[in-house]
Every structure is written in C-alpha cells, then in structure tokens.
From Swiss-Prot:
One of its GO terms (cellular component) is cytosol. This is Guanylate kinase. Belongs to the guanylate kinase family. It comes from Onion yellows phytoplasma (strain OY-M). Keywords: ATP-binding, Cytoplasm, Kinase, Nucleotide-binding, Transferase. PROSITE patterns: GUANYLATE_KINASE_1, GUANYLATE_KINASE_2. ATP binds at G14, P15, S16, G17, V18, G19, K20, A21. Essential for recycling GMP and indirectly, cGMP. The keyword Phosphoprotein does not apply. The lineage of its organism: Bacteria, Bacillati, Mycoplasmatota, Mollicutes, Acholeplasmatales. The gene is gmk.
Amino acid sequence: MKLNKKGLLIVLSGPSGVGKATVRKALFEMTNHNFVYSVSATTRKPRPGEQDGKDYHFLTKEEFEKGIENNCFLEWAKFIDHYYGTPKKQIQDFLKQGKEVFLEIEVEGATHLRKKRIPNTVFIFLVPPEKKALYDRLKKRGTEQEANIAKRIAKANNEFHLAHKYDYIVVNDEVANAADRIIAIIRAEHAKTKRSIRNYLKILEDNGYAEQ
C-alpha cells in the first residue's frame, strides 16, 4: 500500500480591506509549520512596499488574458477593473511536496474555486469586527479614491452573505488572535478522522505492517 502525504490547500478569503495579507504574514511568522504562500497574479498597480513575485505577480492586461486563454489559472476574477488569479502549476507542485499551501484570494475567486471540489481544501472567511473597521482600513491604505472605496464597501456588503458557504469564519479583531485561530483550524483539520487514518496507515507502512 503506497500512500503519499499531501498538504492542505488553505483558502483565506474575505472582503477587500479585511486584512488578509496582514493576518497571513503574521501567521507565517508565528509558526515554523510547513506553510508556503501561493503568490497570486493581478493587473493592478503595486501598492507601496509590494514586490513583484513576492506579494503578487504583477502582469499587464494582455499577459493576464493570455494566461486565461492558456488555462494557466486555477481560478480568476475581475474586481474593480483589475484581474486577479491563482497560477495553477505552483499550487500543484507545492501540494505534491506535502506542503500546506495558502491562497489569499477575493471572495469571487473563492466561489469559483469551491466549484472545482479540490480534495483537502479548507475555506476560511475573514471578517472585520464591525463594518466601520473595513472602511477605516481601506481609507488608511491611502491608495484608493473615495469612489473606489464606496464600490469595495458595497461589494463587501454582498460578500458577507456568502460567509455561510465557507468551512470557517474568523473575526480579525486583533491580527495575532486571528492568526492563532487559523493555526487552530489547521490543527483541527489534520486531526479529522479521514486524514488521521491516512497518516496512521502511512506509519504502519513505514514499520512493515502494510497490507500485502
């Protein structure tokens, strides 16, 4: 019996401005677990401090649309006149290596991804402690005009109604607390019966007790 350990695909999603990147970065700093971040692609301009290939793959509209034609994205969506997408190959490679792959994507992208029913995928919806916090965070960025902030808030109001379709909801009241909750979720997912049995059978196999 040959069993390969495969990692979880952890989809961290939520409205724009909820703090997905901040929580994910804090989580990576808090643990030495086998986490990798799947860098998304976008056609929007980099924000201050963002690096190409680290925070996003920044593409032109033409480059992104060519990627769509060539089926290079696991999921993609258009949001406030910009494309966002998840390159497919890097995720496949990471999961085969048994790594825990973090996706940090918009709600529309998560909706498309859920329809693919990829095994070992965990969907986490990040929400602010109150709606005003979302506006304050978007305003604090200093990169959005008031009209765009209004569009993002209106979209967020619709997205909140999709929270029940996720496996977990995490409130981002304090970054460290939110990161702790996600770590607890991942531990709980690994403790689920199906995954525990898979790991137990692997231990038996390694010790010569595998089925003949």
